[in-house]
Each structure stands twice: as C-alpha cells, then as structure tokens.
C-alpha cells in the first residue's frame, strides 16, 4: 500500500495505492508454505490472517521494519512508497491565512528497494520490485531494475484509463535478466499466485 508522509498532525502526502496487490502476494506466499513477514503501510485492504504483520506509516518506518525483518530468502517490494517527504513537518496544525500559502520544503525518502538490493551482506537470494509507470512502461521499468539492482521487477501501467491503481485487476510484465515476460490482465490474486509460484520455483 501507500506510505503517509506527514505535513502536520492532521495532513499528509499519500497516493492512490490500496495495498491489494501486496496483500495478495503475502497471502499467496503463505499459502505455499512460506514464513511471511508482511510490512504494510496504511493500506485499505486488511492484511492476511495467519502471518506476521508489521504496520508502518512513513517510508523511513518501512525501511526500518524491512531491515528488522531480514534475513530472508526473498524480499518482495510491492508498496507504493512516497519518493519525497516534507523536510520539517509541523508539530501543530498549519493554519490557513488570508492570501497566504504554506511553503513546504521537500527532501528525498530512502530508497528501500535499492538499499536491500545493494546489500553486501545478508542480501536476500531474490529481490523483487515493482514499477508503476504511466509512459514507456517496459523501458522505464527495465532501467529501474538496473538502477536499483533488484533481480526481478514487475512493471505495470497505472495510467488512469487502465483502472489498475486501486482496482481489482492488474496487467504486469515480469522483467528479469533474461528479458521481459508479458502476463495477461488478470485479478490481483491471480497475479499474486503466479508470482508466488515463480518465486518458489526460483528458490527451489
């Protein structure tokens, strides 16, 4: 799901991710017998039952929880983590003033996928990322895989016309060192089942 980056005690920066795909992946892996630690932001979808759940709010909290969950055989990064946060979130609610707009200064959030992918010790055997794109989906996702250092990346087109962000279906392309494998549009549960089986096969 998303992360929430605070502006003040009542406002935050977020995105439209529901958490449905990540939740489905956790459920599918657990169904295959994996011991799953599910690190989740403030998602709309309740987490699967029977697995360890770690709830976080911000990107920095998600990084800390992810590192605490290691070591692991595989790490799957499906969360829609905010790229930026407000540099100095206010401790009190920002008041609206006539003719005035608050000036917000941003700074970059930690890159969780790249941090884990580039670990020199204790790196998971398989690191899987997601690339939510709106333009040049395959090219951008392929470049992201190389930049982040992950083993696989699942690319999807989240343009508004697709209905994927926040919807029940997904259409992904699995990008690995061997190339790109386009999957048909299917439910997020079906995507999760297919990915979970591929992960199990890769680790066997």
Where on the chain are the PLM-derived regions?
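Glycine-rich phosphate/diphosphate-binding loop of Rossmann-like nucleotide-binding domains
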Residues: 1-58
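Alpha-helical scaffold segments in soluble metabolic enzymes
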Residues: 24-28, 61-68, 74, 115, ...
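Structural beta-sheet core signal
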Residues: 38, 77, 127-129
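A glycine- and small/hydrophobic-rich beta-loop-beta segment
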Residues: 41-42, 46, 50-114, 118
